[in-house]
């Protein structure tokens, strides 16, 4: 059994069988008391707790106390703590775990470490990773057609060499400034929305509720989110359908200005629609 945190997207993805779902207990993001009770309540049956330090679906930050509490309760119960940094590892040379000062037992990686090529990886404490050592009796097999492929490894090494501490710091500052500009646009249009996130990752939520939990993020008006996606596309910006924005290192001031202008126009369309009738797309 594993504990996974509630995310800002409801239900199970297609293809997840009831048998798999039966081995997972869903915790409560940023609710330490309830999640700690789940961990303690499942005792020896619990293998791991897995959580994103910032939800990739929603760009909602975990509270430091929540992550510190998870580290404490998993250590207490002899349960592995896994941080999913597939999306968030771009936010620091040591990922968000470095920023929070949290040392997990395992970490999953992806995206940024591949230098633009598809990649996935995991790593952790030596005694945990020793289970995959092929020279040890009873080792867990970990093989795959594309494991350690030279092209991705070379691209990843070069990308990470350029994406050093100075580059990460500068990019996060650019992202924070952009998020502030977008929220200023939201305020100027008097629309029920907010842009959440950290550094170079951010997401627009079209809801009047304070977006502090996954449940609040789910309260966003889905039709207006679709309209925002369409309105941005009509202005030359191809955004993610859920309105997650990621700032690249190559973005220039002119690029950001173009995006803010398109965002302003598109959100104006959304604001007008929200005051009349919700469009059916």
Question: Model segments located where?
Answer:
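Conserved N-terminal phosphate-binding loop of PLP-dependent enzymes in the Aspartate aminotransferase
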Residues: 1-281
């Amino acid at each position: 059994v594993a504990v996974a945190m509630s995310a800002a997207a409801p239900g199970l993805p297609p293809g997840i069988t009831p048998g798999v779902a039966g081995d997972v207990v869903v915790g409560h993001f940023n609710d330490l008391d309830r999640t700690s009770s789940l961990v303690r309540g499942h005792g020896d049956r619990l293998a791991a707790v897995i959580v994103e330090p910032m939800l990739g679906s929603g760009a909602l930050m975990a509270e430091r106390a929540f992550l510190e509490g998870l580290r404490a309760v998993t250590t207490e119960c002899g349960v592995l703590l896994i941080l999913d940094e597939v999306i968030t590892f771009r936010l620091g040379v040591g990922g968000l775990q470095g920023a929070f000062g949290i040392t997990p037992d395992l970490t999953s990686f992806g995206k940024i470490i591949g230098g633009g090529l598809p990649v996935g990886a995991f790593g952790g404490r030596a005694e945990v990773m020793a289970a995959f050592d092929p020279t040890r009796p009873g080792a867990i097999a970990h093989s795959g057609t594309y494991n350690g492929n030279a092209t991705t490894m070379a691209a990843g090494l070069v990308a990470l060499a350029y994406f050093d501490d100075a580059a990460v710091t500068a990019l996060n500052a650019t992202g924070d400034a952009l998020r502030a500009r977008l929220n200023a646009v939201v305020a100027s249009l008097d629309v029920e929305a907010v842009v959440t996130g950290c550094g170079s990752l951010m997401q627009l939520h079209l809801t009047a509720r304070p977006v502090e939990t996954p449940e609040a993020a789910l309260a966003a008006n889905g039709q207006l989110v679709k309209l925002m996606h369409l309105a941005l596309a009509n202005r030359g910006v191809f955004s993610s359908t859920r309105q997650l924005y990621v700032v690249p290192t190559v973005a220039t001031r002119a690029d950001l200005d173009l995006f803010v202008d398109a965002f302003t126009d598109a959100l104006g369309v959304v604001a007008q629609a929200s005051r009349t009738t919700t469009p059916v797309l």
